[in-house]
Structures are given as C-alpha cells and as structure tokens.
C-alpha cells in the first residue's frame, strides 16, 4: 500500500484518555490519531483501557495508537477507536501513516519492520518517503464477490 505520510506533532494527552489507560506514556503525539509512545513492548502488550472513560473522547475520525520499540522488530503498536463497534483494530494502515515517519526519524532508518500486537497480529514492512509511506505484508483472501449496479 502507498498511503499519505502524516507527520505527528507533539501534543498533550486529553484528560479522559489519561484516565482511561493503566500506563502513562513517555511521549504524546498527534496527527489524525493520538500516538502514545512507551518505553517497552511489555506495556503495549498489557495496556488496559477503561472503555467507559475512553468512549468519552471525541477524536472522530481518528483513534489512539499505542507504540513502543519492539523486541523482535523496529516497533510495535496497538490501535483503538473510541465510540466504535470495533474497539481494537487488527492491523491499521492509517495509523502507520504517522507511526512510520516517527519511528523512521527516531531510529534513523528508512525501512522498518512493525508488528501490530492485536489478537490477530499483523507483521508489516514499512518505508517512509518524502510525502508517503509504503506498507507491505502478507494477506489472505477471505471473500470474493461481484456487485451489480
């Protein structure tokens, strides 16, 4: 996939978001989504979210990406959307539009490997370019069909 690069900027954490999570981040960024940066993968694996408090946040159309350096890759992430029927997204290309430039700059690498630590788990090849990001990975077709208009 080739998607637009969204450069994240430093931000402050909304009060409801701070109250909704069990670990406070070491860095807060914002592009379309909030990006909460942590110091290790274990915190991303064990993040707990109070859904009642989390759903008070209005960041439509965005969500919240939790990220840290990875044990076996360049970075890991998880992605949650408040007020959504799908609380945690399995593999989120749109959040990587901001995660890739952040980690590329921080690690001083153009090509990165990312793992999204959802229940399904997604392993992505990532690359930051001037105005866009490239995302690759393995996928399986689960549905084929035709639409007649």
Sequence positions of predicted segments:
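Active-site proximal loop and beta-alpha junction motif in alpha/beta enzyme cores
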Residues: 1-149
């Amino acid at each position: 996939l080739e998607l637009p690069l969204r450069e994240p900027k430093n931000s402050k954490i909304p009060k409801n978001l701070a109250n909704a999570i069990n670990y406070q981040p070491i860095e807060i960024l914002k592009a379309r989504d909030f990006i909460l940066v942590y110091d290790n993968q274990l915190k991303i694996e064990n993040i707990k979210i109070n859904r009642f408090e989390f759903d008070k946040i209005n960041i439509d159309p965005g969500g919240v990406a939790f990220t840290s350096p990875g044990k076996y890759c360049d970075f890991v992430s998880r992605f949650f959307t408040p007020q959504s029927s799908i609380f945690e997204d399995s593999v989120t290309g749109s959040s990587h539009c901001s995660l890739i430039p952040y980690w590329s700059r921080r690690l001083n690498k153009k090509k990165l490997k990312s793992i999204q630590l959802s229940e399904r788990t997604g392993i992505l090849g990532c690359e930051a370019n001037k105005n866009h990001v490239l995302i690759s990975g393995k996928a399986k077709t689960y549905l084929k069909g035709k639409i007649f208009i």
